[in-house]
Amino acid sequence: MEESRAYLELHRSRHQDTLYPLFFRESIYGLACGHGSIFVENVGYNNKFSLLIVKRLITRMYQQTHFIIFTNDSNKNPFMGYNNHFYSQIILEGFVVVVEILFSLQFCISSLREFEIVKSYNNLRSIHSIFPFFEDKLIYLNHESDIRIPYPIHLEILVQILRYWIKDVSFFHLLRFFFSYYYNWNSIFTPKKWISTFFSKSNPRFFLFLYNLYVWEYESIFLFLRNKSSKLRLKYFRVFFERIFFYEKIEHLVEVSVKDCSYTLSFFKDTFMHYVRYQGKSILVSKNTPLLINKWKYYFIYLWQCHFDIWSRPGTIHINQLSQHSFHFLGYFLSIRPNLSVVRNQMLQNSFLIKMVMKRLDTIVPIIPLIRSLAKAKFCNVFGHPISKPVWANLSDFDIIDRFLRICRNFSHYYNGSAKKKSLYQIRYILRLSCIKTLARKHKSTARTFLKRLGSEKLLEEFFTEEEETFSLIFPRTSFTLKRLYIGRIWYLDILVRNDFVNHF
């Protein structure tokens, strides 16, 4: 119980009571201007950023009517001469920097402490590190549940989550003001615009932080109940959702379950259960009976309804048998397939053939969604026939080839873990012919005539030789190991985000 108390109790040293004065410091906005992110695009107003604008903005904020820069109905503020939304963006960026500094270290430390991955943290940051884990664990499990994290969440719930970490009242007034302003300005946080809200081009870091905060709160409760509360009865878990004095309620309920109950429900006692999430999709795999994983299904539904006030139907969580179902995760189709092998055993003058069936994880490249993504990017049509890229025809030959090669390398890098390379070769073929047709379009010729003019069809052979050249730096070019690796699965642990074309499906 002491461990549970230490886990849940919010220590006063973590509370931040003086965040609001940071919004009046010029260094915060300078940091916001120079602080980029690999996950979001440039919002476009950094070019307009200047120290003079920040000084004027801070001077205006010191006045009692500083929020007139937001409430003015005109497009440009008469005091400063700039668009009102531009100034709200500057303050919002400073707001995001303050909360990112506050929570980034806490999230990192709690994750490292929970999963004990301090030494190998750099490698496990890769999203491809999950696939070797799947190869080792999924073959021993029976059931898989696809969980789509529901949305939208009420804005006040986000404020309540932050209240457990921050005690600055002025900070929350400003946060509620941002919610109200952007809700009225863009009609955001509606069900139809949830994705465009949290990954908005105008406010990507702010809404991405809020979304991560929401997911972190939901997973912290889930993991705590999974790891620490194996003796609690199912009918009591609704009262856990008030975070204040959480550990006291758990202590009381443990005593009740021990004294008044002659048995313990095995709801939380699944030692062969694994939970994986990337962005808004989660996967729960288990070895136990369907009844147990079905209980977890309704646990998630009640958690979202009671703690986050989000209505989620039972049909949104699907439970499937791994032996009969393939699921989609991080751009791959994953399935468990039996692998039949025959072993000849000879004893004295008698020989026997022993058939062994072992399970293995199949990782397949989803060719149809990828062709759809390539067609959307104008590299081919909907049937997969390569076409030229007209918008690149004005570039130099070197730039055209370099852009196509970069895309092809990203595909090869991301999908080199596929068990079957036929689909990957098809994607390379589409990109290779699209590059040739783009070059032919630039030189006002056909693809066939363009290749004949060069006198050889070895043009762009890098599309097919990159992996072989990479492996030849480690193994001899004629070695069996090189050939086996070239056709086998290789997981790269330097991939931190999904491929751009994978994000389209």
UniProtKB/Swiss-Prot annotation:
The keyword Glycosyltransferase does not apply. GO terms for molecular function: RNA binding. Its main location: plastid. Keywords: Chloroplast, mRNA processing, Plastid, RNA-binding, tRNA processing. The keyword Acetylation does not apply. Pfam families: Intron_maturas2, MatK_N. GO terms for cellular component: chloroplast. InterPro entries: Domain_X, Maturase_MatK, Maturase_MatK_N. One of its GO terms (biological process) is tRNA processing. It is found in: Plastid, Chloroplast. Signal peptide: none annotated. It comes from the Eukaryota. Belongs to the intron maturase 2 family. MatK subfamily. HAMAP family: MatK (MF_01390). Usually encoded in the trnK tRNA gene intron. Probably assists in splicing its own and other chloroplast group II introns. This is Maturase K. The gene is matK.
